[in-house]
Design a protein with these regions (language model features):
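Detector for short helical micro-motifs
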Residues: 1-97
Length: 97
């Protein structure tokens, strides 16, 4: 099955949640979210490359969680991807009937 190329983006929630980020941090964060949506949980080294920095900014780090392997993920993104996958699956099922 082809990976879903989209996720719901709640712009008001994003705007409020990043209100005190600098423009640079906002850009870094959106790039991290996009990479997480595409690849799943990420190691710190990859996030550092995305952010082009030596330390993940605290404001971005505060939006991420770590799994048992120490990889980073964004819980809201995972929830939205799961809901979307369930919805798409239900639509496919309805088409078969």
């Amino acid at each position: 099955m082809v990976k879903d190329p989209a996720f719901l983006f709640y712009f008001n929630d994003f705007t409020v949640g990043t209100m005190y980020f600098t423009n640079e941090e906002t850009g870094q964060y959106i790039r991290v979210i996009c990479r997480l949506a595409d690849k799943g949980h990420l190691p710190e080294e990859e996030i550092l490359k995305i952010c082009n920095c030596q330390k993940i900014p605290n404001c971005i780090l505060g939006k991420l969680k770590q799994d048992e392997q120490g990889l980073f993920y964004q819980q809201r993104l995972e929830n939205e991807q799961t809901k979307r996958a369930s919805y798409v699956k239900s639509r496919r099922y309805n088409l078969k009937e």
